[in-house]
């Protein structure tokens, strides 16, 4: 279950597990967010299906805040058990600011265990830190093995 936003408009620190239906209900409160959810749903299905076998995805960025019109969403996917040969190659294309990912799925995806360039922390940890303040913040976790997409 996803908790209420804090006074900064963010989720409290930690990974907040939710179902796909909860994510749609909680974060789909504007037409822009509905559009982003459409792309995210396609991406989640691609990570889960086609024998890729991804089991967990974590959602971050302004999408999991009170911002009414986020530009996109940021996500990282757990590499454990993933069949890279079955993975949509766009999930491994980080060129040109991840333009191909944004064009296809309206968001950006990173392997959760890959280090973020500037900080050196893996994306799963990097996503849980506010870039401006350095304080801990919350993200949303999805268990794709249980997700009904």
Residue ranges, per PLM feature:
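Aromatic/basic-lined ligand-recognition segments
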Residues: 76
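Catalytic core of pol beta-like nucleotidyltransferases
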Residues: 1-60, 64-71, 79-149
